UniProtKB/Swiss-Prot annotation:
Organism listed in the record: Haemophilus influenzae (strain ATCC 51907 / DSM 11121 / KW20 / Rd)
Gene: rimP
Protein's name according to its UniProt entry: Ribosome maturation factor RimP
GO cellular component: cytosol
Family: Belongs to the RimP family.
One of the Pfam families matching this protein, by short name: RimP_N
């Protein structure tokens, strides 16, 4: 069964691309009966405030017609930023050689949180270098991941 995020991704992907942006990912967060829907968009040269406004208007119109969210919700549209969340294996592949932070659904070696250099991706597994040791994590066990911004 598809998640709300997956349904929204499928529903909104083409509309966002028609506006010249990539739908990087979607996060839905429920607090009580209220939901926040966050769309992360990206494009070559960076995302502008106008891009976010255009996508927000288009997506709002689609959500008003399709009505996929039963409760009240707030729509937020933004760039993924420097510490961008990673949603798909192809997105992880773009950041091989960089530091990422990962939060797991089920602990591995009694840890849910891992941070290290993304070494490689094989099938549905990612390999991080953590304290000079390889740590292999199953993609399906990743609840949340993001690039660690270096300043």
């Amino acid at each position: 069964m598809a998640t709300l995020e997956q349904n929204l991704q499928e529903m909104l992907q083409d509309a966002v691309e028609d506006l010249g942006c990539e739908l990087w990912g979607i996060e839905c967060q429920r607090v009580g009966r209220f939901m926040t829907v966050r769309l992360f968009i990206d494009k070559d040269g960076g995302v502008t405030v106008d891009d976010c406004a255009d996508v927000s208007r288009q997506v709002s119109a689609i959500l008003d017609v399709e009505d996929p969210i039963a409760d009240k919700y707030n729509l937020e549209v933004s760039s993924p930023g420097l510490d961008r969340p990673l949603f798909t294996l192809p997105q992880f592949e773009r950041y091989i050689g960089q530091d990422i932070a990962v939060h797991l659904r089920i602990p591995v070696m009694e840890r849910r949180k891992w941070q290290g250099k993304l070494e490689r991706i094989e099938k549905d597994m990612i390999t991080l270098i953590v304290d000079d040791q390889e740590q292999i994590l199953v993609f399906g066990n990743i609840q949340k991941a993001n690039v660690v911004a270096k300043f």
